[in-house]
Structures are given as structure tokens and as C-alpha cells.
Curated annotation (Swiss-Prot):
<keyword id="KW-0679">Respiratory chain</keyword>
<keyword id="KW-0520">NAD</keyword>
<comment type="function">
    <text>Core subunit of the mitochondrial membrane respiratory chain NADH dehydrogenase (Complex I) that is believed to belong to the minimal assembly required for catalysis. Complex I functions in the transfer of electrons from NADH to the respiratory chain. The immediate electron acceptor for the enzyme is believed to be ubiquinone.</text>
</comment>
<keyword id="KW-0472">Membrane</keyword>
<feature type="transmembrane region" description="Helical">
    <location>
        <begin position="149"/>
        <end position="169"/>
    </location>
</feature>
<dbReference type="GO" id="GO:0005743">
    <property type="term" value="C:mitochondrial inner membrane"/>
</dbReference>
<keyword id="KW-0496">Mitochondrion</keyword>
<feature type="transmembrane region" description="Helical">
    <location>
        <begin position="226"/>
        <end position="246"/>
    </location>
</feature>
<dbReference type="GO" id="GO:0008137">
    <property type="term" value="F:NADH dehydrogenase (ubiquinone) activity"/>
</dbReference>
<dbReference type="InterPro" id="IPR001694">
    <property type="entry name" value="NADH_UbQ_OxRdtase_su1/FPO"/>
</dbReference>
<protein>
    <recommendedName>
        <fullName>NADH-ubiquinone oxidoreductase chain 1</fullName>
        <ecNumber>7.1.1.2</ecNumber>
    </recommendedName>
</protein>
<keyword id="KW-0249">Electron transport</keyword>
<keyword id="KW-1133">Transmembrane helix</keyword>
<keyword id="KW-0830">Ubiquinone</keyword>
<feature type="transmembrane region" description="Helical">
    <location>
        <begin position="74"/>
        <end position="94"/>
    </location>
</feature>
<feature type="transmembrane region" description="Helical">
    <location>
        <begin position="106"/>
        <end position="126"/>
    </location>
</feature>
<keyword id="KW-1278">Translocase</keyword>
């Protein structure tokens, strides 16, 4: 492999993701606009289509202001880490072919997504601001809590499919989508992904009325744009993963890419719809939901999915 190939391959993967993420921000602003009986962005370019590009250019040409009391290295390192991790997570996704087909894809995704906690905590601490630190601590507690349920839901799904690779999910769902037999898991998964990506109604980390802007309050210009890119890249990733886990592939192999993309965009628009419809949770309600409702239910379902095949083993097939 030549040096050019080594550079072009990742770029061919990264640029479409970043473009999709940029236009997701436009879709969000348009959708929220129409839900609030207004137009949304419509000045920059035809129908406001160039708005994300204008926003990106505007942010990156602004001066990156650093607080005088902040930790300079960590302050600039954490946004870079956030975006890097968000893009690394796309590598093993079968769309329908992965850039790198790993044997333990799901374990890799769980491991890398849990590392994003460090970028949030680091940014809150390095800012040397009480609002940023409180926002970061909230974000970390929320992310770690909901990762527990995401992990348990995935364990249940692995029992259905019989493998840790995402390609086995495609094979297992040829007959029926997993959203039908495992709809309680799908509902909990969707709500947990909302919380994991810090989206409304779980956007307690950036509660403007309490914390100004959360852990990224001291960031401006380029570093702020990197956090913004990471957040929306993670939203798209979670919806792409939800599509692979619960909504299966297309039966028509010619349109498998288009089919996957349409399902992902429908789920992403549901994320935006939820933001327009629901008020923010109180912090204790957020924690009660995961530790007192989701955790017992997911553990019960895991027990059920383990015990059912064992108890039915040896019984004649007609039963």
C-alpha cells in the first residue's frame, strides 16, 4: 500500500461522516423551526442549505480564547480526543462492509465509547470554572450510569444472535428484525442512547438555565466546534448502531446501503422530535430511571433469555 492510499482510505471514510453530521445540524434546526411554527435557517444558500458550512467556517476562523487560569495543554487536548474517539467508533460498523472487520466489534465499541468520559471530565477540570466542572461531573455520572444498561441490553442481544461481531446481527435478522421479539430492549436502548449522547430530555449537562452551557462553557471557536462535531457524530453513530442491532439489513442486496441510511435518518429525526416535544428531566428522575427501572428490568430480561433455552433444552420440537 502506498502512502497516498493510507491517507485517502481514512479520508474517504471520515469526510462523508462529517458531511452527514453537518447537515444533521441543519435538519435539526429546520425541524425544530417548523415544530415551533417558524422557518429555521433560510438565508445562507438556497433554503439555508449552506448554513452548516457557514457555521463551521465562522467557528474555525474565530480566535480560540483560553481562560488565563486554565490548564493549557489539557484544555486543547480534550476536544481533539472527543472528536477522534467519535470517528474511531465508525471503523467497525458494517455499512454493509466495515473498514476493519473485528472479531469483538461490540466489545470494541463499548470500550472506545466509555473513553469519551475522559474527554468530558478533562474539559470540565481543565477549564478551571465551577460551572464547567459541575457540568462535567453530571455528564460523567450520566454517561457511566447509562452505559451499564447499554451493556446489559447488548448482552441480551448477543444471546439472540450468538456472536460479538455486528455482521452476525445482519445474518440473524434475515427472518425477522430484533425490534419485534425484543421490543422492551429496543425501547430501553433508544432512551439510553438519548441519555448517552446528552440529548434532550437528558441534556442536564448543558442546562442553560443552571450551568450556562455545561462542560464546554469556556470553549470558543475551533475547540468548541470540535466538541460540537463530536456530539453530532456520536448521535449519528448511536442511530447507525441501533439500526444494525434492531432493524436488520435490507432483503434486497442492491439497496442495502440506501436502506441502512434511510433507517438511520428516521431514528435521527426521532432524536430531534423528542427534543422538540419533551422538557428536561430533573437530575434525580434521570438517575432513578436508570438505576431503579432500567437496571432491574434488563437484568430480569437477561435471566429470562438465559433460562428459557436451558429450560426448553431436550423438549421435542413440536412443543
Amino acid at each position: 500500500m502506498t502512502l497516498i492510499t493510507l491517507i485517502i482510505n481514512p479520508l474517504m471514510y471520515i469526510i462523508p461522516i462529517l458531511l452527514a453530521m453537518a447537515f444533521l445540524t441543519l435538519v435539526e434546526r429546520k425541524m425544530l423551526g417548523y415544530m415551533q411554527l417558524r422557518k429555521g435557517p433560510n438565508i445562507v444558500g438556497p433554503y439555508g442549505l449552506l448554513q452548516p458550512i457557514a457555521d463551521g467556517v465562522k467557528l474555525f476562523i474565530k480566535e480560540p480564547v483560553k481562560p488565563s487560569t486554565s490548564s493549557p495543554t489539557l484544555f486543547l487536548l480534550t476536544p481533539t480526543l472527543a472528536l477522534t474517539l467519535a470517528l474511531i467508533l465508525w471503523i467497525p460498523l458494517p455499512m454493509p462492509l466495515a473498514l476493519t472487520d473485528l472479531n469483538l466489534t461490540i466489545l470494541f465499541i463499548l470500550a472506545v465509547s466509555s473513553l469519551s468520559v475522559y474527554s468530558i471530565l478533562g474539559s470540565g477540570w481543565a477549564s478551571n470554572s465551577k460551572y464547567a466542572l459541575i457540568g462535567a461531573l453530571r455528564a460523567v455520572a450520566q454517561t457511566i450510569s447509562y452505559e451499564v444498561t447499554l451493556g446489559l441490553i447488548i448482552i441480551s442481544l448477543i444471546m439472540f444472535t450468538g456472536g460479538f461481531t455486528l455482521t452476525t446481527f445482519n445474518t440473524a435478522q434475515e427472518a425477522v428484525w430484533l425490534i419485534l421479539p425484543a421490543w422492551p430492549l429496543a425501547a430501553m436502548w433508544f432512551i439510553s442512547t438519548l441519555a448517552e449522547t446528552n440529548r434532550a430530555p437528558f441534556d442536564l449537562t448543558e442546562g442553560e438555565s443552571e450551568l450556562v452551557s455545561g462542560f464546554n462553557v469556556e470553549y470558543a471557536g475551533g475547540p468548541f466546534a470540535l466538541f460540537f462535531l463530536a456530539e453530532y457524530t456520536n448521535i449519528l453513530l448511536m442511530n447507525a448502531l441501533s439500526t444494525i442491532l434492531f432493524l436488520g439489513p435490507s432483503f434486497n442486496t442492491l439497496t442495502i446501503n440506501l436502506n441502512w441510511a434511510i433507517k438511520t435518518m428516521i431514528l435521527a429525526s426521532m432524536f430531534l422530535w423528542v427534543r422538540a416535544s419533551y422538557p428536561r428531566f430533573r437530575y434525580d428522575q434521570l438517575m432513578h430511571l436508570v438505576w431503579k427501572n432500567f437496571l432491574p428490568l434488563t437484568l430480569a430480561l437477561i435471566t429470562w433469555h438465559i433460562s428459557l433455552p436451558i429450560s426448553m433444552a431436550g423438549s421435542p420440537p413440536q412443543l
